[in-house]
């Protein structure tokens, strides 16, 4: 011990102390230091585990599992889910009244657009008839593109508040979310929101729920989430109608990874549901999916922000992070089961989640090629809590190295792009969205093609390809009947096939059409809103692959293809798109010393053409008017020079031209 203190004093004396004057360290000192550092992490875990319990934790510990309630709010976009969540948090004292707005909409893009993108969770304590209940609320997205978020949320819930806007009634995504919740066996409580609006028709909305969903509407609650009217009636209904989760704290730990996100200080944070057993800081867990072992650094609940706890028990939903943390973001597999090391054989892994399939693809390139690694890191961090995105590296001669990204829909793509710009400061170029096609080769092979670069060339199309199929979706459209003619006209113009037409009220229509997904991603929803003055709603689900006349449309500059712009489209679209492309691209190409020919082509067939005229030098300026032969000679020489330039000269097109061309 004396040797340790002496060594410490000499080290603190700084560089004045000569190395030779240092005494020989006592034997075993280095081993002591090594054992001290290796046990430091264990000591920190022990301190975390022995932390005194807070008043909140003491209160939670006294609540048995039969007084837990896990529920979510499901509805169409903009029917008031996030506002209702705020009122419930205020009622239970989780947040101060009036001090917050959309507490569970945490992303900048959510607050800007007024939509929920990520399912967010919060724990509340509610006293009912003198007994405390632990309520766990999930605020889910309403848009069809984020259905994977909704279905994951249902896995941690026992029931749901089915919310309908009193002025708008049942909409397309209300129907979709109802069937999703019904299939999961959730207990549904009908709630009519916005009853304070002058245009509200709550009785009509209730009747729609009764006839469309065959729900018992006697227990329906009429509320105004904005003013707080009747919201206090919701929580007793939740306690009485929604069943408690099933679980046993005495069994070995069985924990489901529901979501994950990235924190710059703590690393990967995991949102989990405990089915059996309990988990504490310091426990060593193992993943069933990867087999990797981790030490738990901290456990806690969302109240509404991350609030540390000593233990998470069966039936609870909370967060954990590991210490040391996950080395790679890919280790956090959504739907994975975790248990304590040594209990692997005693625990049956949970079924997990169905992987959503990406159906809309774009290419993303950094504006500055030096920022490629920054863009890659940003994409990986956002993928942590959005596993429905697929990523492949690709390169373009025009735009350099980039990524081919797959999304569930166009809004999903747009939101991801916004998050890249806002949260990570990424400057990117995004190509227009495209959909996958299925190539059926004559030798019996099937290939899914997601990039125009992998689409068969013209010769192969004729000799080796039997058929090309494209994906179709079954679209459900709801709108007032006065717009029926315009909507049918729009669907027919987009290669749609009508399936059903029914009135669910005297003035509201539900129309079902089978549409090519390629038409749907080409701003179909924007055109639908325009045709119905904003009153239409749209929901869709995958239908089938169908044979189609699909070709690759390319942009040629002086007969050289521009790979970044190529698209796989239906043959009926090529003339419209081709003319649009050449006209738009011409506006962004600078004049050269020689003529630049811009063409849109399918294989060897040119669809449209524009020409950028060259700079003209007046070679006749110094000639006398009567010198005809000299004039002809100079003009011929200039003509020959231009022809030679066109043959050997490279067209210089700045990257900004591509950015402007690809901009919406």
UniProtKB/Swiss-Prot annotation:
Subcellular location: Mitochondrion inner membrane
Residues that, per the record, bind GTP: 75-82, 139-143, 193-196
Molecular functions (GO terms): GTP binding; GTPase activity; mitochondrial ribosome binding
Residue interval of the organelle targeting sequence: 1-43
Keywords, alphabetical: GTP-binding, Hydrolase, Membrane, Mitochondrion, Mitochondrion inner membrane, Nucleotide-binding, Protein biosynthesis, Transit peptide
Catalytic function, reaction form: GTP + H2O = GDP + phosphate + H(+)
One term under GO cellular component: mitochondrial matrix
Membrane topology: Peripheral membrane protein
GO terms under biological process: positive regulation of translation; translation
EC number(s) per entry: 3.6.5.-
Gene3D superfamilies hit by this protein: 3.30.70.240, Elongation factor 4, C-terminal domain, Elongation Factor G (Translational Gtpase), domain 3, P-loop containing nucleotide triphosphate hydrolases, Translation factors
Domain tr-type G residues, every copy: 66-246
Function of the molecule: Promotes mitochondrial protein synthesis. May act as a fidelity factor of the translation reaction, by catalyzing a one-codon backward translocation of tRNAs on improperly translocated ribosomes. Binds to mitochondrial ribosomes in a GTP-dependent manner.
Record HAMAP family: LepA (MF_00071)
Protein family (similarity comment): Belongs to the TRAFAC class translation factor GTPase superfamily. Classic translation factor GTPase family. LepA subfamily.
Protein's name according to its UniProt entry: Translation factor guf1, mitochondrial
Source species of the chain: Aspergillus oryzae (strain ATCC 42149 / RIB 40)
């Amino acid at each position: 011990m004396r040797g340790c203190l002496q060594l410490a004093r000499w080290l603190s004396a700084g560089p004045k102390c000569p190395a030779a004057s240092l005494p020989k360290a006592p034997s075993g000192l280095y081993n002591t230091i090594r054992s001290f550092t290796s046990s430091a992490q264990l000591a920190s875990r022990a301190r975390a585990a022995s932390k005194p319990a807070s008043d909140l934790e003491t209160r939670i510990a006294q609540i048995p599992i039969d007084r837990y309630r896990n529920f979510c709010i499901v509805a169409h976009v903009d029917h008031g889910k996030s506002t209702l969540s705020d009122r419930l948090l205020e009622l239970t004292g989780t947040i101060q009244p009036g001090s917050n707005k959309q507490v569970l909409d945490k992303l900048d893009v959510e607050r800007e657009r007024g939509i929920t993108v990520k399912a967010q969770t919060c724990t509340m304590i509610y006293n009912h008839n003198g007994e405390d209940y632990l309520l766990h609320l999930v605020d889910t997205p309403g848009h069809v593109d984020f259905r994977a978020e909704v279905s994951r949320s249902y896995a941690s819930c026992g029931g749901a508040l089915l919310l309908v806007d009193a002025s708008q009634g049942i909409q397309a995504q209300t129907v979709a979310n109802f069937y999703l919740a019904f299939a999961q066996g959730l207990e549904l409580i009908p709630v009519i929101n916005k009853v304070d609006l002058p245009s509200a028709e709550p009785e009509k909305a209730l009747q729609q729920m009764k006839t469309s969903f065959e729900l018992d509407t006697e227990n329906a609650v009429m509320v105004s989430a904005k003013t707080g009217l009747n919201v206090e009636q919701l929580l007793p209904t939740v306690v009485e109608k929604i069943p408690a989760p099933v679980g046993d704290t005495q069994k070995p730990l069985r924990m489901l990874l529901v979501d994950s996100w990235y924190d710059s200080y703590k690393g990967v944070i995991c949102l989990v549901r405990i089915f059996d057993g309990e988990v504490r800081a310091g426990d060593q867990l193992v993943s069933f999916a990867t087999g990797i072992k981790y030490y738990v650094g901290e456990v806690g609940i969302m109240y509404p922000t991350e609030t540390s706890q000593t233990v998470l028990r069966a039936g609870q939903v909370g967060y954990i992070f590991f210490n040391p943390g996950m080395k790679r973001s890919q280790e956090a597999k959504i739907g994975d089961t975790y248990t304590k090391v040594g209990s692997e054989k005693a625990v049956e892994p949970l079924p997990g989640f169905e992987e959503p399939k990406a159906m809309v693809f774009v290419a993303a390139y950094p504006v500055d090629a030096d920022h490629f690694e920054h863009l890659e890191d940003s994409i990986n961090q956002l993928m942590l809590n959005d596993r429905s995105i697929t990523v492949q590296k690709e390169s373009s001669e025009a735009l350099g190295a980039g990524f081919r990204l797959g999304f569930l829909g166009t809004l999903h793509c747009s939101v991801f792009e916004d998050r890249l710009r806002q949260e990570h400061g990424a400057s990117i170029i995004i190509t227009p969205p495209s959909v996958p096609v299925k190539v059926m080769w004559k030798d019996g092979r099937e290939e899914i093609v997601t990039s125009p670069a992998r689409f068969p060339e013209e010769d192969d199309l004729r000799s080796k390809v039997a058929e090309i199929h494209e994906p179709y979706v079954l679209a459900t459209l709801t709108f007032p009947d006065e717009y029926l003619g315009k909507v049918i006209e729009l669907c027919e113009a987009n290669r749609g096939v009508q399936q059903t037409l029914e009135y669910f009220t005297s003035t509201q229509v539900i129309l079902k059409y089978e549409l090519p997904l390629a038409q749907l991603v080409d701003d179909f929803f924007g055109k639908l809103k325009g045709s119905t003055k904003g009153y239409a709603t749209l929901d869709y689900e995958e239908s089938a692959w169908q044979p189609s006349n699909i070709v690759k449309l390319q942009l040629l500059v002086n007969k050289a293809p521009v790979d970044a712009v190529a698209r796989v489209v239906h043959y009926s679209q090529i003339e419209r798109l081709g003319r649009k492309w050449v006209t738009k691209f011409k506006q962004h190409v600078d004049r050269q010393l020689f003529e630049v020919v811009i063409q849109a082509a399918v294989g060897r067939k040119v669809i449209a053409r524009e020409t950028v005229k060259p700079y003209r030098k007046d070679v006749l300026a110094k000639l006398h008017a009567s010198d005809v032969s000299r004039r002809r000679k100079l003009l011929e020489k200039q003509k020959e020079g231009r022809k030679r330039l066109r043959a050997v000269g490279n067209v210089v097109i700045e990257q900004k031209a591509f950015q402007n061309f690809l901009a919406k």
